[in-house]
């Protein structure tokens, strides 16, 4: 009896897809020793137009929902003549795909190699399916060697969730396959990843890069003191990449001082993957334009906004075959600028302003939690754990002291005065010494 054998369904050599045509483009860049990061804008936009049209053809042929929406919008062929015409393509809203694993799937289910899903904290989760080629072929085509300086001599500690969502596995693939680094799969405080073991592993293998969330970077630094591990001696990082949560520039400065290294921001999502990342200038996020096309729209009128105008971030993925996201409304707020960065990169610069659903109304103004955190972190006596509590128009701050000689009452008075100067309203302040730490996303706003 002949033994049954199994063959991997996807390989770089054998796989066929609408995306194969872009291999030659990126291979030519590699041969010329350049990356998409510094291409002239016209060449970037020419590539993006071709990639978008290839994606439109793919979803037209492979997905009933996408095709019906394009036809309703007046498309008779799945093609646009310029990037300006992308506005004719319908938006993809979260509620349409929430809880529906098939809605925008563009491959046969047996061709799926990986499934991720969002946390579902605001409703049913969003499922995102990938083919193996999505993950190990097309996602690795664009190189960003100016934004990521890591090489095979680096050891990257990935302290992000490996369960359900994309971040842990996504960063592991990025660093292993794109840069050849060793990876320490720390996870984020789960059953098999207690903090003490994570710190010990970083010490033993001399991690040079840490990828994690802002709150977990603070927790690791805090716990290192409790476990007798000295940052700067036992663990000597050269860089931290923050993702998964937003944070203020002041919070980032605190982490840089604590860890003694550069800290940069990375913006992405389980649905869309990589979107944008900071360069060494730290003046905004460069959009990773080999992977995505980003637009800014007015969330009410849905009109596209020009450079410099703040609105909702809309993302179109360019190198996906299993489940492309076309004009996906992220729910995040920001604005775009043409790159005039001293780093020399030509990719557009994105400035994030938080999530629409998290904006806080105080008096007559709307505030991003990042801005309020920035104001609070301007007080050096305040620790990195806090809550903003909102209740029927009242605003209360719960904060921890940090290496201060002030009494709790003195610190509360100092916070009240500083925040009143910053936002123009009075707030209640409670000094606590027991704000809970979390291994999940930090809860900063309580309503």
Question: What kind of region is each of these model predictions?
Answer:
Residues 2-34, 94-236, 246-254, 258:
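Active-site phosphate/ATP/adenylate-binding loop shared across adenylate-forming ligases
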Residues 184-187, 264-266, 428-432:
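General small-molecule cofactor/ligand-binding pocket signal
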Residues 56, 237, 382-383:
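Core-facing hydrophobic residues within beta-strands of well-ordered domains
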Residues 1-117, 123-137, 144, 204, ...:
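Nucleotide 5′-phosphate-binding alpha/beta core
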Residues 210, 314-425, 440:
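AMP-binding/adenylate-forming catalytic core of the ANL superfamily
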Residues 238, 247, 251-340, 357:
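Conserved AMP-binding/adenylate-forming
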Residues 59, 118, 210, 255, ...:
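Residue-level signal for inorganic ion chemistry
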